[in-house]
Amino acid sequence: MAAGIVASRRLRDLLTRRLTASNYPGLSISLRLTGSPAQEEASGVALGEAPDHSYESLRVTSAQKHVLHVQLNRPNKRNAMNKVFWREMVECFNKISRDADCRAVVISGAGKMFTAGVDLMDMASDILQPKGDDVARISWYLRDIITRYQETFNVIEKCPKPVIAAVHGGCIGGGVDLVTACDIRYCAQDAFFQVKEVDVGLAADVGTLQRLPKVIGNQSLVNELAFTARKMMADEALGSGLVSRVFPDKEVMLDAALALAAEISSKSPVAVQSTKVNLLYSRDHSVAESLNYVASWNMSMLQTQDLMKSVQAATENKELKSVTFSKL
């Protein structure tokens, strides 16, 4: 507590000195930060395999400092989600969540499309041919499979680091489950999104029906997409709020996604990860509950040294990239 009081006093003294300095007339302060060359950095950094991430269905690279790039890596199968994928995604994002050096993540698909969704041929033995003949036991078995598959995308949402989905080509079925668990979605002009499950005789059960209404805020449109399995093209996805930006092609989109990840990773990890936690809490709770939650959260987070470092950089017109924040 004493350390927090000392930090608060130092921050107050710093602000007082800056506010009364001659180059800040009228006791006003601007927190405008100069732009960062994230775009150049994103496109100019050679990719390297990330240590401790070796998978069959995924490729994980260190795109740049503090940024990991996770690729769905079954291009010959249109990145279809086989049994190995469902296990490896959980393993991958559990590691990322614990990786103190990682501050932002980009997810994309290798090859010609983001993903064709569930690999039904690979998973047929588990889903369509359960063992036994007792209805209750078969039901419990299938429920266990469903909840494990749900966790594959829950770990993305629960990951404290912001996750950016970069979609090109088709994003079908399970792909929509995946991207709606991400924090930010970019897409290329050739992208389309399809809630495909109704065409194969089932209801989507690993996240789309729960997250998509919250993402786009239009229940009528969600119902239309889920009942018909029609394609939502890139421009409609932008207009509905499913994605925040559309780019001419995959290459430009990936550069932009990595640039955004670099910009996010230049900020205080305490601030960014606290923001993600509170945004997710606020999505599922009332305004009053969420205000109480963030007050309890920030009663400790306001004591971070990152606050003083960020304010000092702003008052000196320095880029946050020049500030060294400790790992989190």
Curated annotation (Swiss-Prot):
InterPro entries registered for this protein in UniProt: ClpP/crotonase-like_dom_sf (IPR029045), Ech1-like (IPR045002), Enoyl-CoA_hyd/isom_CS (IPR018376), Enoyl-CoA_hydra/iso (IPR001753), Enoyl-CoA_hydra_C (IPR014748)
Report the subcellular localization.
Mitochondrion; Peroxisome
Q: Using the UniProt record, name the top-level EC class of this enzyme in a single word.
A: isomerase
| SUPFAM superfamilies to which the protein is assigned, alphabetical | ClpP/crotonase (SSF52096)
N6-acetyllysine modified-residue sites: 327
Look up the record and name the pathway of this protein: Lipid metabolism; fatty acid beta-oxidation
Primary localization: mitochondrion
Residues annotated for substrate binding in this entry? 116-120, 174
Give the GO cellular component terms, alphabetically. Answer: mitochondrion; peroxisome
The EC designation for this entry is 5.3.3.-
Query: Per UniProt, which keywords does this protein have?
Result: Acetylation, Fatty acid metabolism, Isomerase, Lipid metabolism, Mitochondrion, Peroxisome, Phosphoprotein, Transit peptide
Any one Pfam family match given in the protein's UniProt record, by short name: ECH_1
Q: Tell me the residues on which N6-succinyllysine occurs.
A: 231
Q: Which GO molecular-function terms appear in the entry?
A: delta(3,5)-delta(2,4)-dienoyl-CoA isomerase activity
Disulfide bridge positions per record: none
Give the modified residues of type Phosphoserine: 268
The reaction(s) catalysed by this protein are: (3E,5Z)-octadienoyl-CoA = (2E,4E)-octadienoyl-CoA; (3E,5Z,8Z,11Z,14Z)-eicosapentaenoyl-CoA = (2E,4E,8Z,11Z,14Z)-eicosapentaenoyl-CoA
What job does the chain carry out? Isomerization of 3-trans,5-cis-dienoyl-CoA to 2-trans,4-trans-dienoyl-CoA.
PANTHER family, from UniProt?
DELTA(3,5)-DELTA(2,4)-DIENOYL-COA ISOMERASE, MITOCHONDRIAL, ENOYL-COA HYDRATASE
Q: What is this protein called?
A: Delta(3,5)-Delta(2,4)-dienoyl-CoA isomerase, mitochondrial
